[in-house]
Regions:
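Non-heme Fe(II)/2-oxoglutarate
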Residues: 1-74
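A broad, low-specificity signal marking well-ordered, structured residues that form hydrophobic/aromatic
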Residues: 2-3, 73, 78, 102, ...
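Short loop segments at secondary-structure junctions
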Residues: 8, 108-112, 136
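Short catalytic/ligand-binding loop motif for oxyanion handling, primarily in non-cytosolic enzymes
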Residues: 12-15, 37-39, 86-92, 114
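Internal catalytic-core helix/loop-beta-alpha segment
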Residues: 74-99
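A short beta-strand-loop-beta hairpin characteristic of the jelly-roll/cupin
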Residues: 88-91, 99-101, 107-126
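Conserved metal-binding segment of the jelly-roll/cupin
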Residues: 123-136
Length: 136
């Protein structure tokens, strides 16, 4: 089941997160491969949290309200992905990051991108929207 919630965070809190992540002082890091390392695509990432190392960003606290609202019982990873505008859509392979848990995708900007699921459902990128689904 795919659950979509628009206007997920209070406007002021969302704008604060958006401003931080789109600002000059926010660090992004190159990652080879969007889905798999050899897929010939790339993206920029910011890792907020990984269980192996714990909080991995000085900005981890911006996600407190978000985690409470999604009622997360355990966090496996908080990661921001930044992809770039391309002349044509660059589809990636379907994949599962984890099994037996839920994934939440939170959209920071509105653009012509989307998240596509194996059943054909497409979720448009709309700022302050969250898409929650079973990871497997």
């Amino acid at each position: 089941m795919i659950k979509i919630i628009d206007n997920f965070l209070p406007e002021e809190e969302f704008k604060s997160i958006q401003s931080l992540m789109l600002g000059w002082g926010f660090n992004w890091y190159y990652q080879k491969g969007r889905t798999y390392e050899d897929d010939e695509l790339f993206l920029m990432v910011h890792m907020f949290f990984q269980p192996e190392v714990g909080p991995n960003s000085k900005h981890i606290d911006i996600w407190n309200t978000f985690m409470n609202k999604v009622e997360a019982k355990k966090c496996e990873r908080i990661k921001a992905n930044l992809t770039f505008k391309t002349p044509t859509h660059e589809p990636t392979l379907y994949h599962s990051d984890y099994s037996d848990m839920k994934t939440a995708i939170f959209y920071i900007t509105t653009n012509n991108g989307y998240t596509e699921f194996e059943n054909g459902v497409r979720v448009s990128c709309v700022s302050n929207r969250v898409c929650i689904f079973d990871s497997n």
